[in-house]
């Protein structure tokens, strides 16, 4: 690996780790209705499992309700089954091709559990960032050992990698803090 590409590659890997965290945090339920809450729902349709968003339109008419407008009338029971199997803790009311999902208020205890889960996701992401940093430093050591870079370059690049790691680590902290505020807001 070339020294010029190393930092860029590490940055791309760290960016992917942050995206994964973002997707995990989207799946955590806050007190407000969000269509992202249904991202994990798959529906048995046309002989395979497909995401709910490919057979219905999703909307949030108010802060406590998600509407699922199924496009094909024959798919309504499959969509209901998919929502039930996803085990989201939601009950649904079906009216023709419209499925309403009322979002119950979170208890204080459940909010605290979700905050703990968000912090766990954050810590897992930080571990990924540290592993990416470690891999980058090991690559630098190989480059130095093979006399591709000199010791000064090694120290300079390792400091840059550390700064990059710190930058992404602070992004994790701010994402977790923001999600915690969303969860704890009643």
Curated annotation (Swiss-Prot):
GO molecular function, one term: ribosomal large subunit binding
Residues making up the signal peptide according to the UniProt record: none
GO biological process: cytoplasmic translational termination
An example Gene Ontology CC term for this record: cytosol
Subcellular location: Cytoplasm
Pfam families: RRF
Database matches in InterPro entries: Ribosome_recyc_fac, Ribosome_recyc_fac_dom, RRF_sf
Lineage: superkingdom: Bacteria
Gene3D superfamilies, per the entry: 3.30.1360.40, Ribosome-recycling factor (1.10.132.20)
Alphabetized UniProt keyword annotations: Cytoplasm, Protein biosynthesis
Primary localisation category: cytoplasm
Function: Responsible for the release of ribosomes from messenger RNA at the termination of protein biosynthesis. May increase the efficiency of translation by recycling ribosomes from one round of translation to another.
Family affiliation: Belongs to the RRF family.
Protein's UniProt name: Ribosome-recycling factor
Taxonomic lineage from the root: Bacteria, Pseudomonadati, Pseudomonadota, Alphaproteobacteria, Rickettsiales
Gene from which the chain derives: frr
């Amino acid at each position: 690996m070339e020294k010029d590409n190393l930092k860029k590659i590490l940055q791309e890997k760290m960016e992917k780790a942050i995206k994964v965290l973002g997707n995990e945090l989207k799946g955590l339920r806050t007190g407000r209705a969000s269509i992202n809450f249904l991202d994990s729902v798959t529906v048995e349709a046309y002989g395979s499992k497909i995401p709910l968003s490919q057979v219905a339109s999703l909307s949030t008419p108010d802060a406590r309700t998600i509407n699922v407008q199924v496009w094909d009338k024959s798919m309504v029971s499959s969509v209901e089954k998919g929502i039930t199997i996803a085990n989201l803790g939601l009950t649904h009311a079906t009216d023709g091709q419209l499925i309403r999902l009322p979002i119950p208020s979170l208890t204080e205890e459940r909010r605290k559990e979700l905050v703990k889960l968000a912090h766990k996701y954050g810590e897992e992401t930080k571990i990924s960032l540290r592993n990416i940093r470690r891999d980058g430093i090991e690559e630098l050591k190989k480059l130095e050992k093979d006399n591709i870079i000199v010791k000064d370059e090694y120290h300079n690049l390792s400091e840059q990698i550390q700064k990059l790691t710190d930058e992404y680590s602070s992004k994790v902290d701010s994402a977790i803090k923001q999600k915690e505020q969303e969860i704890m807001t009643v």
